[in-house]
From Swiss-Prot:
Gene3D superfamilies: Bira Bifunctional Protein, Domain 2 (3.30.930.10), Serine-tRNA synthetase, tRNA binding domain (1.10.287.40). Homodimer. The tRNA molecule binds across the dimer. This is Serine--tRNA ligase. Keywords: Aminoacyl-tRNA synthetase, ATP-binding, Cytoplasm, Ligase, Nucleotide-binding, Protein biosynthesis. It comes from Syntrophobacter fumaroxidans (strain DSM 10017 / MPOB). It comes from the Bacteria. ATP binds at R261, S262, E263, E348, I349, S350, S351. Its EC number is 6.1.1.11. One of its GO terms (biological process) is seryl-tRNA aminoacylation. HAMAP family: Ser_tRNA_synth_type1 (MF_00176). L-serine binds at T230, A231, E232, E284, S384. One of its GO terms (molecular function) is ATP binding.
Amino acid sequence: MLDLRFVRDNVDKIDMMLRNRRMDLSLAPLIELDTQRRRILREVEELKFRRNKASEEISNLKREKKDSSLLIEEMKEVSRRVKTLDQELTVIEEHFRDFLLLIPNMPHESVPVGADEKDNPVAKTWGSKPELDFEPKPHWEIGEALGILDFERAAKIAGARFALYWKMGAALERALIAFMLDIHTKRHGYTEVLPPFIVNSTSLLGTGQLPKFKEDLFKLEDRDFYLVPTAEVPVTNIHMNETLEESELPKLYTAFTPCFRSEAGSYGKDTRGLIRQHQFNKVELVKLVKPESSYEELEKLLLDAERILQELGLHYRVVTLCTGDMGFSSAKTYDIEVWLPGQNTYREISSCSNFEDFQARRANIRFRRKGQSKTEFVHTLNGSGLAVGRTLVAILENGQQADGSVSIPPALRPYLGNIERID
């Protein structure tokens, strides 16, 4: 959520931001609500001043044994008016906050202006595409041929956009989770947490999924419970409504969770394979940091996510998301896109973002500098480290051999009993 004072003083700037983000949202209702709000506050202040002054007059009249009944009756009417205005103000402030929650974050000045993913510039690349002397297959064909992925039975159990992992498929998924967590905790210094996989609406509001993206979520019927769309939600909200000490920052957390998404609006996209599922596993990285270090921490976060792909020997590129493609809560985002030879394309495998104080303001996460009483909002960051299913996809497609087997990256073999290939 943006700061109210900033919104009030920068209407033109925010209008431009909304256009750059390709968002059809007028600030006129917010400006009108703010006008009403300030009018009521002024009137309440004047009435209270009048009431306080009248109280002194009433005291003087009583002391002088003069009639004060008319003034007392007038003040009763003033009190009734103040009560009515307070009720109006409560309603207006609720509408005001609801509208503020619909305004996305301001992009950082370094974010390129663009319409969609076609305008995302490539920031860097690592490695090279594998040289295959045969026609590469997509991962769903590889997995089904090896008997490690079963989409037909998954559809029988749950429906479309689910997968059943068999044998080495299940073992490979589990190995990747352990591998990622080990690197992030032992090499990168993150603290591992295992959060609830169900969250309430307050947590989703804090990280920005609600109210705008309600249709993307799975809600439990008749309960204020939602399945987590990403570990970002429960992990960021660990410190909701808390004030941390400066010495406690930065906070670095990593967590594995399954993620659940309705994929509303994705009809017809990626209907085969593991790329777009209702349920998938992900290892998440979350940071709570001081404002002045957040962009340095974003670059470190990106490197931490890249490290996983480098250890696995998978070719990838990093793109900077333009204004028209970036997420609602983000001030700046890098996407890591891994090369998939079976589909002859790059696909997102991690998204690393700095939200500045946007989420912290919504979730009320603050910190206090040493020797000061005043508190400030922390800056929050997160990134996938990585999406586990898509990493498995990349291993199958990049490691496929002409005989139909799949070579396991050496770094992952200790997690699989030193097996070198799946056949």
